Amino acid sequence: MELYRPHMKSQLQDSKTWDVCIIGGGATGLGIAVEAANSGLSTLLIERGDFAQGTSSRSTKLVHGGVRYLEQRKISLVREALQERDRMLHNAPHEVTDQAFIIPATTYWKLAYYGLGLLLYDLLAGRRRWGRTTILSKSKVHTLLPRLKGKGIVGGLQYLDGKFDDVGLALALAKTAAKKGAVLLNHAKVTGFQKKKGRIQSASIQDGLHGDAMTIRAKAFVNATGPFSDALCRLDNPRHKNRLKPSQGVHLTFDADVLPGDKAVLIPKTSDGRVVF
């Protein structure tokens, strides 16, 4: 049955009070649902669209330690990210695989500079390292990246990071939460809250597929709606002031023949100072 929607909806009863109701079915909300259900809490998750439909399905698809943050001296952040990379591989080996990256260099100084950075990256990974960084000759770089047209390339470096199916991992979390006893209902929108003595007691839900309304009672409500968090807060308090300052990245999708082969490329610095994967 797992995520069979009619079965999930049939478990919603106006008289029941859930231990926790999670609003938002992206990676964060689904992860919370797994932890809550695994802790023995009666858990309900509400998602207004499809699971992982928003930000969680629009990632870089990379599982990496944040090599670019080394230049900013965010060592603890990189170390933590490398630990999480290893944890993801351990917990979801069916969704996470390694990915070779090549960094082309246009001067020997840059080759040495990037090499030292990747050496530190490998050292921070320690036993969790996925492979050694290797130095590539100019001819090897062009062999591995035949479409590369950069002028003056003197060589490059190859290191290993990871990639994953973000939607696949999110759905795996949803199925795990359901197996642990959580109820997850998608295409259901929160339309308002009811409070008592300043505390939220229940939420009004509208089924996005059939239009019927429901009232959900819970001891705790979790806002896991990501960039829509402020909008949800205004349902509780119309005078709520925005707390988030959303940032936006751009991901472009090309046919595989644009960059043939199985190697990825990292451009450490573009003309406008960006890092491009």
Residue ranges and their predicted role:
Residues 61-144:
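Dinucleotide-binding Rossmann-like beta1-alpha1 core, especially the glycine-rich loop
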